[in-house]
Amino acid sequence: MSDKFVAIGDIHGCVLTVEKLLEDIVKQHKDRKFVFVGDYIDRGPDAKKTIDFLIEFSKSNSCIFLRGNHEQMLLDFQDGVSSIGSWQRNGGKETYLNYMNEKKKFELPYQHYHFFRNTRLFFDSAEFFFVHAGLDPECSIQESIINEQ
């Protein structure tokens, strides 16, 4: 028997919405694997709480977390690859403020950094291929993966 998946994307810091959605799904379907296809942060009000919730949810549910462009922008900023301007122009201001410490400095908890860093670029099951974005319609899936790496 093949796996049954629930794919969820573009939460964008809306933790209350995703909590309610997942509560309803879990009540009805106990045997699902959850594939979150990225964009957990930015634009919405509660990026930090969203990540806390997803980490906690994954402790009792089968979850696969993919990286969206918003997580990549946060990692690029955190790792010093790009400036904050690019990230904030693309909705990162709310997330930046969520992670500000009492000294008004950006502080990403290690557990959250680890979560972002360990997201996958894609997930390939026996029947489905999951990705946030970036596949070239002119190429096969294999060629697109090779080009991205």
Protein language model regions, located:
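A short local structural element in Rossmann-fold oxidoreductases
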Residues: 19, 75, 140
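N-terminal active-site segment of His-dependent metallophosphoesterases
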Residues: 1-53
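Cytochrome P450 core scaffold surrounding the K-helix E-X-X-R motif
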Residues: 139-145
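Hydrophobic/aromatic beta-strand patches that form the interior of the parallel beta-sheet core
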Residues: 6, 35, 64-66, 129
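Catalytic core of the metallo-beta-lactamase
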Residues: 13-16, 124-126, 133
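Histidine-centered divalent metal-coordination motifs
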Residues: 10-12, 69-70, 132
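Beta-strand-turn-beta hairpins that frame and shape the catalytic cleft
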Residues: 1-6, 123-129
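Active-site neighborhood of divalent metal-dependent phosphoester bond hydrolases
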Residues: 43-126, 137, 149
